[in-house]
């Protein structure tokens, strides 16, 4: 079902509506959509900003952290007055000020096995803007089992990556069969991150989400996009479904209940 647009919306979204790939029907589809963004930090901030601006009707923003001053160099939905405020609520307040068409739900929690089904329920797309491997594997697994497209992004210093995981394509475990050992991957507090880098990658994630919602263009399904800000290069590397994947391969599991996302994210099929 798509929504009819009133005069104010026809004006607000006029630059979309004039394009054949969107039009009034596509804009109505965006306004009828529900997107969950997990993480309201570096990647989540630009994704939230643009998904709200383009008129995604329902946004769920999930984050258990609070705004710190060191976040403000890159997390563009938060400002100095938000320091100490839960990121989910700060991002939600930004959305409310940006676009009254968007109903935004802040969820001040870390996604885990106990709440992930409730978090993603009813969503058309999930955007993974998290910063840790247990959450990435958890979102991959539950979205695969629930049949929900998932847009992944990650950043490191001057480099970023993104891919889109659709229900009938390869999953995150096909791409990265094993998570790194805990503590072996440094975070941005240790290595630093170029302030504009998450903006680029987060906007790519928002673009992928929009394409999925509009059913237009070619998604990054089965392709991992690499971005190097220092060389200003983009490269895509194809990947395929792993027939032995424990989630999407033959004979794989069909539930997250027996998977330990705290220790290793590994799945035993024995």
From Swiss-Prot:
Position(s), cross-link Glycyl lysine isopeptide (Lys-Gly) (interchain with G-Cter in SAMP2): 113
UniProt-recorded Gene Ontology molecular function terms: ATP binding; metal ion binding; nucleotidyltransferase activity; sulfotransferase activity; thiosulfate-cyanide sulfurtransferase activity; ubiquitin-like modifier activating enzyme activity
Record GO cellular component, one term: cytosol
Listed EC numbers: 2.7.7.-
Requisite cofactors: Zn(2+)
InterPro entries, alphabetized: ThiF/MoeB/HesA, ThiF_NAD_FAD-bd, Ubiquitin-activating_enz
Record note on disruption phenotype: Cells lacking this gene are deficient in sampylation, i.e. SAMP-protein conjugates. Moreover, they do not grow anaerobically with DMSO and do not show DMSO reductase activity, but their growth in the presence of oxygen is not affected; however, they are retarded in aerobic growth at 50 degrees Celsius. The lysine tRNAs of the mutant strain appear to be nonthiolated.
Active site: 188 (glycyl thioester intermediate)
Record keywords: ATP-binding, Isopeptide bond, Metal-binding, Nucleotide-binding, Nucleotidyltransferase, Thioester bond, Transferase, Ubl conjugation, Zinc
Keyword Transferase: yes
Keyword rRNA-binding found: no
Binding-site list for Zn(2+): 171, 174, 245, 248
UniProt subunit comment: Interacts with NcsA.
Function summary: Likely activates multiple ubiquitin-like SAMPs for protein conjugation as well as for sulfur transfer, via ATP-dependent adenylation at their C-terminus. In fact, it is required for the formation of all three SAMP1-, SAMP2- and SAMP3-protein conjugates, and for molybdenum cofactor (MoCo) biosynthesis and thiolation of tRNAs.
Membership in a protein family: Belongs to the HesA/MoeB/ThiF family.
Protein name, UniProt field: SAMP-activating enzyme E1
